[in-house]
Amino acid sequence: MNVRRALLSMMSVLCLAAGACGGAEDVARPSSRGAIVSVAPVFEMTGPETSDYLAEWKYPVAAANGVRAHRVVYETVAADGTPTTASGLVLVPDTATERLRLVSYAHGTTVRRDEAPSADGETERARTVQFAAAGYAAVAPDYLGLGEGPGAHPYAHAPTEASASADLLLAARALLADQHRELDPGVLVTGFSQGAQAALALARELRGGTVPGFGLAASAAVSGAYAVREVQAPAALDGRVEGRRAVLYLGYWITAMNRIYHVYDDPAEAFQPPYAQRIEGLFDGYHDLLAVTSGLPNSPQKLLTPEFLALAANPTGAALRAMDDSDTVCDWASDVPVRLYAARGDRSVPFENSQRCMKAELGGTAELVDLGDIDHGDTVRTALPQILDWFRKTQPPA
């Protein structure tokens, strides 16, 4: 980052500290969802710099705009409804347009909190930058417990993915207002993997009119586990999901859901030794993917106890509630365009998840785009440029 951008960043910090980002008078104010707690500059790029950056990440955008990025910490709610905070990335295109269309991009599975989009998550950051480079305002929620958010991350918990994403929209609107710009109320929503579930959860809230001042303009979700009980959990057990990926998914999901639904009293009820003694520590948000996977076995049958293998296949009680609470992201009807992108070659999130979504209420108006015989990571690289092109044709940035 050059000296000019560094000086601009320092000036932004000083201005924000004295203004909307909070002084002493803010400490005692009542909690308000979407209210800004703090703002910090992350980077600023000119048009040519943005173009070079996206070319390096293989998300090229023709005639890319300059982009300014902010890390926003804002007020939201925890899984039990109590006040908490979360962070997210807000990107503003360097254009003369005062009224901007907004894109919300929800990121994929992240085990380390500092790999969230507003922190050091360069891969997910680049995916968000492409929308701002095209002239949209863009946001990327970190979700609860990642980035600057306190506590542990409630992995794949659709209700809090939706609330954290929705409240970031409110924070972004306030930030843009301070810059004398406004957001069009129609939001374009997209996301990948875990973020596909989050995207549809947010889209449902926008369609239902529960996000003040915002509605849904279009949604495009890529390779999401929309049906944990009927598809994703069984596939993790029967080999459709590759072994280590299945272990990562089940270990992350079970430990996260235990904090909300209390699916076990002791890790030894769910996990075999020696993994029962270490698994909660591995998913503490401070271990990277290599550390997590190297500390766990290569198959669910080696990870889970017989009781929890049976529970994953035929859930009851708290496990069933945990699945059902997040398996509703396709149970709504849309009157705006919705696309689901998925691949038959995906060994992390089977294609059947999207097929199941198409059989739900959303399927009556959604379109399923088959990306072919490619694996999970390739789906987002293939789909996102298509999604940007679709957004630009149907809902131009300004």
Regions found by a protein language model. Name each.
Residues 5, 22-98:
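Catalytic-loop region of hydrolases
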Residues 78-87, 91-135, 148:
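Short, surface-exposed "cap/lid" segments of acyl-processing enzymes
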Residues 92-99, 171-190, 211:
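Gly/Ser-rich "nucleophile elbow"/oxyanion-hole loop immediately N-terminal to the catalytic nucleophile
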Residues 222-331:
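Accessory cap/linker subdomain of secreted extracellular hydrolases
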Residues 334, 339-346:
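Short beta-strand/loop motif that positions the catalytic acidic residue
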